[in-house]
Amino acid sequence: NIIEQIENFNIKNNNIEISTTQKSPSALDIDNIHSELYSEPKDAYFTQNPYCIYPSENGVDFAISIDEAKNLLKEDKEECSIPLKVLYPNITTSMLGNEAFPDLLSQYSTSYSTRDQKRTTNLKLAANKINGTVLMPGETFSYNKVVGARTISAGYQEAPIYVSGKVVDGVGGGICQITTTLYNAVVYANLDIVERSNHQFVPSYAPASRDATVVYGSIDFKFKNNRNYPIKIMCTVSNGIANFQIYGLRSNNDYEVVISNRVTGTTSNAIYSEAYKILKQNGQVISSTLLSQDVYKRH
């Protein structure tokens, strides 16, 4: 049978002839490439019934005309590169107004000295980067990614920072107060903390285990939107008050959040502390979750 013939076939003693045909490659069709690549930017919008937010999307297009792209192919080159450009929507997700984020989920404030103008400048620069940020469900916020590098060219000033257990002047000093204020607002909104670190010393603007520090490139503050709907972060730095507000849509499953922090021990060189997130409903404690256990150096 056929199977036996195949098994008994010895390729070394038999020649196999395969007919081939030569065919030139198809010419590149710029119009077709453009139609497959091109995408329109999409404006953000929302509906109230049912409640749903549709985020904005960037588009893409040739950075040159189609005729210019076709002329590139006529050049005698082995490779041809067509530059591209991003098309931005007219209405981004962060531009959606209060109607899209009707409920105040949480807010938190810390105070700062307006006499230190350089530090105040740093606070405002960092806050402005975060203000208006929208997080979709499941999306993670990275402080370092959103705020970016703290450099002189970005407008940051030298102000006191903690380095190797000492207080020295450094570019961007003070922005950890923005991190700390946001951290507390995030906890009160009952969002998931992904990454958070405490300072070397207990800062003046927050009690032990209620702070959050960042160092660009090494220490970040991250949290995740664990809600079913998008949230929007609003912040202001004015008249000695740094304030964060987180907006979204409340649900029947939301709890009252209480943060309980305490110093658990001290030595001549260190302070030990911890913080818990307590969820309440109708005055009854539903759960108590450890947020952090921290160690600080004494000044």
Residue ranges and their predicted role:
Residues 8, 12, 33:
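Aromatic-residue-lined binding/catalytic grooves and analogous aromatic/hydrophobic interfacial grooves
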Residues 15-20:
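A cross-kingdom signal targeting lumenal/periplasmic-facing segments of multi-pass membrane
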Residues 4, 21-299:
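Well-ordered beta-sheet/strand-loop patches within structured domains
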Residues 12-14, 227:
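Short flexible coil/turn linkers enriched for glycine and charged/polar residues
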